[in-house]
Design a protein with these regions (language model features):
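Helix-loop boundary and gating motifs at the non-cytosolic
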Residues: 2-57, 246-252, 304-340
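Loop-to-transmembrane helix entry
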Residues: 43-53, 177-178, 256-267, 334-362
């Protein structure tokens, strides 16, 4: 078995640089979408509905793109077609978003933006494993983490910096110029960064990957599918029952209508798992649904615990992304009118706050977590 060539620092840089641009786009979305929605007439109560694209596209797009990118090979490569398609669509969404004049168009553009970012971002996570030998994985993921943090800091700070350079932050008849220019610059940065990675890297072809001991293209692990075929339907009906219970509880307990979505997702997963199990039992397990559900059901216990942690952490993150701008604008800047200069000054300051938390998180991830992991 051959070993992959050692990558020098320049090679490590090229492999992960696209993530810098992707995170600029992601940070612009997180720090500014509530401001855009409210500027276009969305109420505070509407924000959670308008933001629903973000978690749903991640939930649906990531496993699908991950599944297909593992099984793709074209003359342009394995992951790079996804990089390119996602980057082009995300850049277009960033260019169009700040010129939205009606609320529903901005909400629709968010669906395109978030889905496109996920299309490009998900294969980037696997790209390090594809391109690097195992003894370089730590260095590769560390540099990727650095680019993630740097992109998030830069994207979050764009409107604040433009305001201090003299660009108007007033929302006169639409999105403020600071936000508009930030999205345009962010779209260009995202596209150029991803194109840099595409243009400076060459993926190993299937024969080379096989020589390195990697699974052959399209080769699927049969164990998850066999395990899925052997499963009973009890857990699937339990998911459906849990979802139905949540749906019933919403009016009884006067819960927010957004909770209906959680119940619907649990029901949908239960139905999907029944279909996946029946397909696996019928000898038709080599399909995306059975493979994805089989991988999910067969996760190690540690990963299931991590998934629970991620559930609560991402719940908190979305609450922060959705509501920080209106809360800071109202209580720290005394403004509730999204067209006012004070409100948009508050929106700029939220970008600074988000830049700080991203910067601190990156430093902790690079300096503290490796030492902590070594002790566990």
């Amino acid at each position: 078995m051959n070993e992959k060539p050692v990558q020098r620092f320049g090679g490590l840089w090229n492999i992960s640089f696209g993530f810098f641009g992707i995170q600029i786009g992601f940070a612009l979305q997180n720090a500014n979408m509530s401001r855009i929605f409210q500027t276009l007439g969305g109420s505070l109560d509407d924000l959670s509905y308008l933001w629903i694209a973000a978690p749903l596209t991640g939930l649906l797009v990531q496993p699908i793109i991950g599944h297909y990118s593992d099984r793709t090979w074209t003359r342009f490569g394995r992951r790079r077609p996804y990089f390119f398609a996602g980057a082009v669509l995300a850049a277009l969404a960033l260019f169009v978003m700040p010129d939205a004049r009606i609320l529903w168009f901005a909400a629709l553009t968010l669906w395109v933006l978030d889905a496109s970012i996920n299309v490009s971002m998900e294969p980037f996570r696997a790209f390090v494993g594809d391109m690097l030998r195992k003894d370089q994985h730590t260095a590769g993921y560390a540099l990727q983490t650095a680019f993630i943090g740097a992109g998030a800091v830069v994207g979050s700070l764009f409107p604040f910096v433009l305001t201090h350079l003299g660009v108007s932050g007033a929302a006169l008849g639409g999105v403020p110029a600071t936000v508009r220019y930030s999205f345009w610059f962010g779209g260009l940065a995202l596209l150029l960064a991803v194109l840099w990675t595409i243009g400076t890297t060459r993926e190993y072809n299937p024969e080379q990957m096989a020589a390195f001991g990697e699974p052959r293209l399209g080769e699927t692990a049969t164990h998850p599918v066999r395990a899925l075929a052997a499963r009973g339907l009890g857990s699937s009906f339990a998911w459906i029952a849990a979802g139905a219970g949540i749906v019933i509880a919403v009016p009884m307990l006067s819960l927010q209508k957004e909770v209906y979505l959680l119940g619907a997702l649990l029901i949908a997963y239960g139905v999907a798992s029944i279909a996946a199990i029946l397909l696996a039992r019928g000898g038709k397990g080599d399909n995306p649904l059975s493979l994805i559900v089989g991988d999910f059901a067969g996760m190690p216990t540690v990963m299931k615990r991590l998934a629970l942690v991620q559930f609560f952490s991402w719940s908190a993150l979305f609450i922060m992304w959705i509501y920080t701008t209106p809360v800071v604008a109202q209580y720290a800047f005394g403004a509730s009118d999204p067209t006012s200069a004070a409100y948009n000054a508050g929106g700029d300051w939220v970008g600074v706050l988000f830049a700080v938390y991203n910067g601190v998180a990156t430093i902790v991830a690079l300096l503290v977590l490796p030492q902590l992991a070594a002790r566990i």
